[in-house]
């Protein structure tokens, strides 16, 4: 089980990323646009650097929603590999069965 402070930090980062997502995407679009001049790009870069560091989605970490485990997390379910197996074996995830060949 991960420390609650680390899990809460990641949740807080998710909220900040969602809050600034549109603003960040607009600024990045200006930077990638070939038609915008140097002045527009420099102001966009300065505004982008002025955004909070935690507003970047790169700083997020996929974690298991039950245990907070940072590695071995399946995005589709939001669960770590261990909890996914436990829940799937109990038949609580519809459509998931144990492979047999």
Curated annotation (Swiss-Prot):
Task: Look up the signal peptide feature and give its range.
Answer: none
Q: Which InterPro entries does this UniProt record tie to the protein?
A: Ribosomal_uS14 (IPR001209), Ribosomal_uS14_bac/plastid (IPR023036)
Domain of life, per UniProt, equals Bacteria
Biological process, per Gene Ontology: translation
A GO CC annotation recorded here is:
small ribosomal subunit
What keywords are assigned to this protein?
A: Ribonucleoprotein, Ribosomal protein, RNA-binding, rRNA-binding
Q: Which GO terms describe its molecular function?
A: rRNA binding; structural constituent of ribosome
Enumerate the SUPFAM superfamilies for this protein.
Glucocorticoid receptor-like (DNA-binding domain)
Checking PANTHER family in the record gives:
30S RIBOSOMAL PROTEIN S14, SMALL RIBOSOMAL SUBUNIT PROTEIN US14M
The role this protein plays is: Binds 16S rRNA, required for the assembly of 30S particles and may also be responsible for determining the conformation of the 16S rRNA at the A site.
Subunit note: Part of the 30S ribosomal subunit. Contacts proteins S3 and S10.
Instruction: Give the family, as the similarity comment puts it.
Output: Belongs to the universal ribosomal protein uS14 family.
This protein is called: Small ribosomal subunit protein uS14
């Amino acid at each position: 089980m991960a420390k609650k402070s680390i899990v809460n930090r990641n949740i807080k980062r998710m909220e900040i990323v969602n809050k600034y997502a549109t603003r960040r995407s607009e600024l990045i679009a200006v930077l990638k646009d070939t038609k915008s001049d140097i002045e527009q790009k420099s102001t966009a870069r300065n505004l982008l650097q002025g955004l909070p560091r935690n507003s970047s989605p790169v700083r997020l970490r996929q974690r298991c929603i039950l245990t907070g485990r940072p590695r071995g997390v399946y995005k589709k379910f939001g669960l770590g590999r261990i909890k996914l197996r436990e829940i799937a074996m109990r038949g609580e995830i519809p459509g998931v069965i144990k492979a047999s060949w």
